[in-house]
């Protein structure tokens, strides 16, 4: 459509040709986008981001299994925290010192 691009003596496309091709591509893309995806700025009902998100209303359904498990864990943690005292870990057992005995025999005997 636009013909071959000009090449310099080294066989590379010139910088100006690349810029022109880029501008043509961008203009063609913008033209295609505006014709196929026309956006009217007067209709903002679908994209009104200023309204705060509302918290969903609680349902009349019974709590889910996950909620039951989490509540059970909370109760157990509260019960163990109130009844258990902070216990220090047991001290490590005392290590007895081993007497060093030399049980080596001479390698050569005369």
Swiss-Prot record:
Pfam family, one: DUF816
InterPro entries found in the cross-reference section: DUF816
Protein name, entry field: Uncharacterized 12.5 kDa protein in HE65-PK2 intergenic region
Provenance organism: Autographa californica nuclear polyhedrosis virus (AcMNPV)
């Amino acid at each position: 459509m636009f013909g071959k691009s000009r090449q310099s003596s080294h066989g590379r496309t010139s910088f100006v040709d690349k810029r022109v091709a880029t501008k043509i591509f961008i203009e063609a893309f913008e033209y295609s986008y505006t014709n196929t995806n026309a956006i009217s700025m007067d209709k903002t009902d679908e994209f009104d981001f200023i309204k705060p998100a509302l918290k969903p209303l609680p349902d009349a359904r019974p709590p889910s299994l996950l909620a039951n498990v989490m509540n059970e864990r909370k109760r157990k943690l509260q019960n163990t925290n109130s009844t258990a005292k902070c216990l220090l870990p047991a001290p490590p057992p005392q290590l007895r010192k081993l007497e060093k005995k030399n049980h080596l025999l001479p390698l050569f005997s005369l």
